From Swiss-Prot:
Highest taxon, organism lineage: Bacteria
Protein name: Acetaldehyde dehydrogenase
Protein family: Belongs to the acetaldehyde dehydrogenase family.
Signal peptide location: none
Record EC number: 1.2.1.10
Function: Catalyzes the conversion of acetaldehyde to acetyl-CoA, using NAD(+) and coenzyme A. Is the final enzyme in the meta-cleavage pathway for the degradation of aromatic compounds.
Top-level EC class: oxidoreductase
Molecular function (Gene Ontology), one example: NAD binding
GO biological process, one term: 3-phenylpropionate catabolic process
Catalytic reaction list: acetaldehyde + NAD(+) + CoA = acetyl-CoA + NADH + H(+)
HAMAP family reported for this sequence: Ac_ald_DH_ac
Catalytic-site annotation from UniProt: 131 (acyl-thioester intermediate)
The organism's taxonomic lineage, starting at the top: Bacteria, Pseudomonadati, Pseudomonadota, Gammaproteobacteria, Enterobacterales
Length: 316
């Protein structure tokens, strides 16, 4: 099966790590172009050393390159505002081009590979939510497939050193996009997301806490569902793991809790603690927040490439 050529817009931490993943592990993908706006960026320099074509003139530079004619999939690792413009420009030049959005822009549907990749594999633009979303939404979905989830809250704690300028500029978008995806993909009636930039030295690995309030159900069934989901995520993010056993608390009907925006709640509270260790391809191992984004994007693109190859075979 021939490989599909891809380009990455954004030569920062995420874009560079993704490039290295594709070069080392791409099964149906061929790394063709790295796009940046800073001619002195380490990402562009590294791409050139690895034999990848580059441009420092942004998406316009990409579209002016001869390689653009063969590009099937573009990863956008810029910012939410830039992605809206990039999508419009690329779509005008190539209406059928596939975009994988690693910003919080969310022009296309949210995609969390282990939960809903199959139903989004033929979309022209998919959004990878956020690092916190990729880590925690599978846990919310794991509870949702056992019991009705009324409320889910996630706290993503990441090393301050792993948060580049793009992440810092998109904090509000992070919380909004993650909260919405907890509902749309995770299945919660109401979602809330909090991000913490941890300044500790030496930097700590990404840690995530997930609280889910659901109808009462078998705790064994919920724990089994969560463990099964964690194993499924590990298939493409090997450093993803439960930090300890799942904890439960029954909230009785005669002692309900009041949830802002939800009201009185009684039922089952499920608490999940996660840790995500990065693969250290380009970024340090503590930057699991960035690794889970690039790994999820890679898994999505691989499926898209297979789908495109099948369609090309059927049309031949």
């Amino acid at each position: 099966m021939s490989k599909r050529k891809v380009a990455i817009i954004g030569s920062g931490n995420i874009g560079t790590d993704l490039m290295i993943k594709i070069l080392r592990h791409g099964q149906h993908l061929e790394m063709a172009v790295m796009v940046g706006i800073d001619p002195q960026s380490d990402g562009l320099a590294r791409a050139r050393r690895m034999g990848v074509a580059t441009t420092h003139e942004g998406v316009i530079g990409l579209m002016n390159m001869p390689e653009f004619a063969d590009i099937d999939i573009v990863f956008d690792a810029t910012s939410a505002g830039a992605h809206v413009k990039n999508d419009a420009a690329l779509r005008e030049a190539k209406p059928d081009i596939r975009l994988i959005d690693l910003t919080p822009a969310a022009i296309g549907p949210y995609c969390v590979p282990v939960v809903n990749l199959e139903e989004n594999v033929d979309q022209l633009n998919v959004n990878m939510v956020t690092c916190g979303g990729q880590a925690t939404i599978p846990m919310v979905a794991a509870v949702s497939r056992v019991a009705r989830v009324h409320y889910a809250e996630i706290i993503a704690s990441i090393a301050s050193k792993s948060a580049g300028p793009g992440t810092r500029a998109n904090i509000d978008e992070f919380t909004e996009t993650t909260s919405r995806a907890i509902e749309v993909v995770g299945g919660a009636a109401k979602g809330k997301a909090i991000i913490v930039l941890n300044p500790a030295e030496p930097p700590l690995m990404m840690r995530d806490t997930v609280y889910v309030l659901s109808d009462e159900a078998s705790q064994d069934d919920i724990e089994a569902s969560i463990n099964e989901m964690a194993e499924a995520v590990q298939a493409y993010v090997p450093g993803y793991r439960l930090k300890q056993r799942v904890q439960f608390e029954v909230i009785p009907q005669d002692k309900p809790v009041n949830l802002p925006g939800v009201g009185q709640f009684s039922g089952l509270k499920t608490a999940v603690w996660l840790e995500v260790e990065g693969a250290a391809h380009y970024l340090p191992a503590y930057a699991g927040n960035l690794d889970i984004m690039t790994s999820s994007a890679l898994a999505t693109a691989e499926k898209m490439a297979q789908s495109l190859a099948r369609k090309a075979g059927e049309a031949a």
